[in-house]
Amino acid sequence: TERRTYLYITVSHKTAYDMASKYGFNQEQREYLDELLSDENNSLWSSVLYGTSGEDNQIVAVALSQVGNVGGRPYWSWYGFNSRVEWCACFVSWCANECGYIETGIIPKYASCVNGVQWFKDRGQWLDGSAEPLPGMIIFYDWDKQGQSGQQDGRADHTGIVWKVENGYVYTIEGNLSDKCTTSRRQIGEYQILGYGVPEY
């Protein structure tokens, strides 16, 4: 006689809002999710499915899920630091790692903004700060803070992830902005924007 064993698996559909509940999104994060899933962003989600160099919403979604974190411990400790450091680059690297982009060489693991810029420039994946970016690009800033980080010197001081571009403004998600994960908005071409790393998603 022949004996057969059958394994039955039930696969159930989970919506984005199901997952938002599972991961404990707060009200602000849910509002960002609503905006990401609005009809006006359909073309952006198509690019995630079919691929567009430099544009990606997976890393944007991961970054948005972290909005509200204070102190950056998950990011700088993941990087390997035993105590707090300036953690904006650790945050970008952590988000990239969550998407598998460090392992695949799409985005570097970097704790120094200067090193992040150089990685993209070495590969010809760099846009000047006057350019109009796409979601998922990596933004770098050269702050003009006399008496603090000093005047602009052409070297990156801060980094984040481009969320969207709308009505002449670039919206970003950044870590270590006043020691928090938060969103920011600046005019395209604003003089403190050094440029953009363009990952080959």
Where is each model-derived feature located?
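Generic alpha-helical secondary structure signal
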Residues: 31, 54-61, 114-118, 131, ...
